[in-house]
């Protein structure tokens, strides 16, 4: 979260496919040299903040600290903790980034009637696993989307994004998702 005036940058504008985008190294270096606050936003749920820092280093974008990274999962958790003091039982699909934020916050991950069901990108799920999510939603779990992307580029190929999966789950279950992906007002509110 930004603690003073500064810049909010989406991770994908700095790095894609483990390569720095043109001008990314120079931009972050200029922020650091001028002591300008910045926050890098991402909806990536498959990786942890440490993984992101390592990827940035690999790309030649040096000196980024943990406090410079803010994920959509962090925003979702912060929102839920602020608005639902009784929230404790959650479940998720997605990667280790979601799991780490949930466990670091003290949520109990359970497959039995979670209050909130977080949905991040997981390209290895089966029909039966989506059926399990659907069942939990029909039993009363609140759907939480941490990645809005309708389409995402993987190895220069367009693939179905997490936002498309969330829309499928909304349609099937009749449960409207709480949405925390990049570009949402709530993500920007909690990031700034």
What are these regions (language model features)?
Residues 6-8, 86-94, 118-119, 145:
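Short hydrophobic beta-strand segments
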Residues 76, 84, 90-94, 98-105:
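Ligand-binding beta-strand-loop-alpha-helix segment within the catalytic cores
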Residues 74-85, 190-192:
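Conserved phosphate-binding catalytic cores of ATP/NTP-utilizing and phosphoryl-transfer enzymes
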Residues 1-23, 27, 40-42:
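Asp-based phosphoryl-transfer active-site loop
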Residues 1, 106-115:
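Short acidic low-complexity segments
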Residues 65-75, 113-115, 148:
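A short, structured active-site edge motif that brings together acidic residues
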Residues 27-56, 69, 89-93, 140-153, ...:
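Substrate-recognition element of Asp-dependent hydrolases with the DxDx(T/V) motif
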Residues 114-192:
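Conserved acidic, metal-coordinating active-site core of Asp-based
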